[in-house]
């Protein structure tokens, strides 16, 4: 075999080796990036109040339909209204409602806010069923902290908005999210 032919073969082998090495390194880097992007968000420290608004923590039982306990990465804060204009449909009554249906329905959210208190139902880093999008990989249920605002007639709606804004600001800061991460049910 001639010297030139051996050089060409060695160059081809070297090129193949470099190409395979680059592919392996790229795969490792992508796997590391995917791991850090997809691993669940670490849960923040619990609070008993947000800006002087009491926060009552009353988690739904883990392993129920409403709280399967699946951890995820937080990407959004999703703001809703309860749609319940019934008398006494305040945060405490919505908390009772969630506990009553927890075993039987895929319906849940993380917080209920009214004009004087906030109920905390599911840890922020677990999925809940509030956005109507199932478990869509980019959807609010899988990626969003759900906040429901009470709209009952005896509720001071303006104060509820302020309370929800304070809670949202606290969550944005706690999870290092920007304002673009705030969504509504319809987004």
Residue ranges and their predicted role:
Residues 46-176:
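Active-site-adjacent loop/helix surface patches within enzyme catalytic domains
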Residues 2, 7-8, 13-16, 23, ...:
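Basic/polar, cationic surfaces and motifs that engage anionic cell-wall
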